[in-house]
């Protein structure tokens, strides 16, 4: 007994004419039970670093394990392709990357809900995907009913600032557009290349600037590497550990909130996620928070905890 896996395609109006010329037509991997029933939950995975839908990967193995234990009930679970040339996606609208928030909220959810007659919607993801799940849920509690944020970007000062000197050195005397084109063709990026692409990508989402040649501003001076506090201030407006206090009423509307983090997370996200948890707790937000032994990577099995939790809450 295993889940049905189907790949469908959706053509997005929200992504038309995106600055990166990334594909407008996207694949969505759909996991569905043998019997499809009305009003089942719709769960959407938001990938971390450029995850693309693949049949029979670790994610599908986890889902099939849960399905055989009857923990997925009648839920429809989808894994869309949200990849960008920056190798990251924060799932918000940006003229420097594309309108991914609109793509999800205005296109994917209505399309899938109509196709499978689903009801409550839940988002889940790790790292950037966890950030996206939180951010979309707190901004659209009328559409999103719950989310699972697995060690998502938070307390940005610990996550991103260590990568800024690396990015400065990686980009020194280089044209950023040429750099992006070169790295987009590589399958085996070095650690420094990944870190540089991460800062470039975050700049595209957090500090976009339509008047700039690149459509975004970096948080450091290109010639010296010195920090730019004015740009950084744009970034931290998106920091869940800081902005959560602005969304208390919206969070209270949600049916399910799941947070977790590894106590050895390489990006110190045990600080960010712990802070987010404490602020939710202080403000009376019902949620589940777990810490586990491990780091930031190779943690797909954490979905064995969050997905059944979301499905149970969103099936009520």
Question: How would you label these PLM feature ranges?
Answer:
Residues 1-316:
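Non-catalytic cap/lid and distal C-terminal segments of serine-dependent acyl enzymes
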